[in-house]
Amino acid sequence: MGKLFGTDGVRGKANEELTPELAMKLGEATSNFARKGEKVFIGRDTRRSGGMFKSALESGMASHGLDVIDLGIVPTPAVPFLGKEKEMDLGAVISASHNLAGDNGIKFFDSRGFKIPIAWEEKIENFVFNNVDSKVPGREIGQIYREKKLKRQYVDRLLKKIVPKNFSTGLKLVIDCANGANYKLGPLLFDKVGVDTTCINTEPNGDNINLNCGSTNMESISRQIGRASCRERVCVGV
């Protein structure tokens, strides 16, 4: 039997190694772990291929009776975080992290918000490679819900759970959003905290995620920090 999962989900070149057909089959395979009528939370980043893979994954899940909660473009931690709070049965994120836009990937989380175990990955691979077909009748097809309000709830929960009081005291922050999934929520979070913030790379176009920016190109944020006024405040890059 072949191998689909690596150390961080299923990844590959979009439309070459990772195709819509495979994404749909992966969605169907999740019926191994979530029963008819149970909830699956899905999020993605800003890659051009993300919408295509999201539609395919959702279709596979719904065709097996699962209800999908589509969070839209959100950072990876938002799916397990919100999913656990809202009692999801399974989570999925479409992203290739720090890779460039031509790559993409799909990773899954269990109901506790943890990465699924290797035994689950092997069951999914067995389902895909053996072309198992267990679609439900039309009257039992799952529903797909678009949830926009949960993004704001995620930011609010982070403020309450993670950000300490007086966090902004004497701090000047430069945030490199890398034209990725945090391009809106990152600035929103620190704006609510009250931090003196400069945000860069906040204009994703589907092709520029991590392009000359982000964790693999620290020169970009270093230049911004150098330009920032740090004489009277501590200056930190994120």
At which residue positions do the language-model features occur?
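Gly/Ser/Thr-enriched, mixed-charge loops and adjacent short helices
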Residues: K13, N104-R223
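Positively charged, low-complexity/disordered segments
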Residues: R231-V238
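N-terminal small/polar loop signature for handling phosphorylated ligands or for N-terminal nucleophile
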Residues: N32, K36-D103, L188-S229
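Pocket-edge structural micro-motifs
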Residues: R44, D110, E232
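An N-terminal, well-structured beta->alpha segment
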Residues: M1-S59, S63-G65, L90, Q143-L173, ...
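Short, electropositive, low-hydrophobicity segments enriched in small/polar residues
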Residues: V10-E16, P20, R47, T76, ...
